[in-house]
């Protein structure tokens, strides 16, 4: 009698759990715009969500610790004249976020560590180059201030956000609307999917298609694709019978998928969130109430189903926390921020362990906030892997880094030359922009206090009159 061999994996028992009710973010009017993006972006400091707003597009930015009910007058980030379609935090500065809009522009914003008293309306820079709506944003994983945008004009533009210049424009590769764009780990290649049902690998600096596969999935619904850590590709799509699929591809041989998993029948496009440290891909569909996750390995069958986290409410969007924002003391290997119609709910993925010690096997060194290259170095042909950090002592986000406006680079946040001596907050020079912003905030607070004092005085007088009248 043969014995069934159980596959050995430290991720066989990954469990998902929704955070407690008091850890959710309540009373948020999540955007109802029809667009297949995540509508949510998160980093170790902030949570950003695209919201409903009159008179243009807007998104809300909350400190992670600001859970509970969000005041209806909480300041928004506004400035777009059309709906916001995508947002993405800069991986090298936790206070910088980019937004893309139906109004054809991309805006880059500096988010202060303190809570502003009014809407943030002035971006650091507005990037204008698309002729139709912009629905996709993606920062370069290793080069400072390099941002990619893709629009309804079938064009991909790669910007140097620090100078506002167009580094590259890929305008003759895609014959139809682009559905997704993803960098590989060192930012040397792009993987794109398009309405023409073709999966492409592109060298952006040569404006060349390195490899392509027509109809990787036979269905008519949109595709998505992401690179794996070893350079393979994961794609999500639909079969001819509308079954949702996950496929693994070797770019050196696009004839047949290395592995193919078929799932349920549904209309929701599956958004893949890939973690290179664990080689787990999480699949989240808009309108679904579940998250499926699979482990990708180098031995057959290559794609291994792990589990499904299910809940009652369908998701309107999803945010995925970078590894450096996780709680390693709780063996947390992933954290999602699930958007409901009126709230955002954290979902935590853990690997149960008996020991309280740091689990080295769960937490290899992971990309940190330091860029490996400058924009001009990358453009000249240099490549570099991400600068890694250890999570053993628990990641602590760096203090707020102010954008210094210079002719060369408006997002120049290069750290001091000597890392051994840190400059205290009292020694750090304030830019003119920061000083003016703080003075405006102080004036607004004074005006508010004065108005409240006048209101209190008026109410006290009314109370005295009422008391006198009853005597």
Swiss-Prot record:
Repeat region (WD), residues: 79-119, 129-169, 173-212, 216-259, 264-304
PROSITE patterns reported for this sequence: WD_REPEATS_1, WD_REPEATS_2, WD_REPEATS_REGION
Coiled coil: 426-468
Composition bias, Low complexity: 419-429
Gene3D superfamilies assigned to the protein according to its UniProt record, in alphabetical order: YVTN repeat-like/Quinoprotein amine dehydrogenase
Keywords linked to the UniProt accession: Coiled coil, Repeat, WD repeat
Pfam families in alphabetical order: DUF1899 (PF08953), WD40 (PF00400), WD40_4 (PF16300)
Keyword Transferase: no
Domain of life: Eukaryota
Gene from which the chain derives: Coro6
Disordered: region residues: 410-433
Naturally occurring in which organism (per UniProt): Mus musculus
Protein name stated in the entry: Coronin-6
């Amino acid at each position: 009698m043969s014995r069934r061999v159980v596959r050995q994996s430290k991720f066989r028992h990954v469990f998902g759990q929704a955070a407690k009710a008091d850890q959710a973010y309540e009373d948020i009017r999540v955007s109802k715009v029809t667009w297949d993006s995540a509508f949510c972006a998160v980093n170790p400091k902030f949570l950003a969500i695209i919201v409903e707003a009159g008179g243009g597009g807007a998104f809300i930015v909350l400190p992670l610790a600001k859970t509970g009910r969000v005041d209806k007058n909480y300041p928004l980030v506004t400035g777009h004249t059309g709906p916001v379609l995508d947002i993405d935090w800069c991986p090298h500065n936790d206070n910088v976020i980019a937004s893309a809009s139906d109004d054809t522009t991309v805006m880059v914003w500096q988010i202060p560590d303190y809570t502003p008293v009014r809407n943030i309306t002035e971006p650091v820079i507005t990037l204008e180059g698309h002729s139709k709506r912009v629905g996709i944003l993606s920062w370069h994983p290793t080069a400072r201030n390099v941002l990619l945008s893709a629009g309804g004009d079938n064009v991909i533009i790669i910007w140097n956000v620090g100078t506002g210049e167009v580094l590259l424009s890929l305008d003759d590769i895609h014959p139809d609307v682009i559905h997704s764009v993803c960098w590989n780990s060192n930012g040397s290649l792009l993987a794109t999917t398009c309405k023409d049902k073709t999966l492409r690998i592109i060298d952006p600096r040569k404006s060349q298609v390195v490899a392509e596969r027509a109809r990787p999935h036979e269905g008519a619904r949109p595709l998505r694709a992401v690179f794996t850590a070893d350079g393979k590709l994961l794609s999500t799509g639909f079969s001819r019978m509308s079954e949702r699929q996950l496929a693994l591809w070797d770019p050196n041989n696009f004839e047949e998928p290395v592995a193919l998993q078929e799932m349920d029948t549904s209309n929701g496009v599956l958004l893949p969130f890939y973690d290179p440290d664990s080689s787990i891909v999480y699949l989240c569909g808009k309108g679904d109430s579940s998250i499926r996750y699979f482990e990708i390995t180098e031995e057959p069958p290559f794609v291994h189903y792990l589990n499904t986290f299910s809940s009652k409410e369908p998701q309107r969007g999803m945010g995925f926390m970078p590894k450096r924002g996780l709680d390693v003391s709780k063996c947390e290997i992933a954290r999602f921020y699930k958007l409901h119609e009126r709230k955002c709910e954290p979902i935590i993925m853990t690997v149960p362990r008996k020991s309280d010690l740091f689990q080295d096997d769960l937490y290899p060194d992971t990309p940190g906030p330091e860029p490996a290259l400058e924009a001009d170095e990358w453009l000249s042909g240099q490549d570099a892997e991400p600068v890694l950090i250890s999570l053993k002592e628990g990641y602590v986000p760096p203090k707020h880094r102010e954008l210094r406006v210079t002719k060369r680079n408006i997002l120049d946040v290069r750290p001091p030359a000597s890392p051994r001596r840190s400059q205290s907050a009292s020694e750090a020079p304030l830019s003119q922009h920061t000083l003016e912003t703080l003075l405006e905030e102080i004036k607004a607070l004074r005006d508010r206090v004065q108005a409240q004092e006048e209101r209190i005085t008026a109410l006290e007088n009314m109370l005295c009159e009422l008391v006198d009248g009853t005597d």
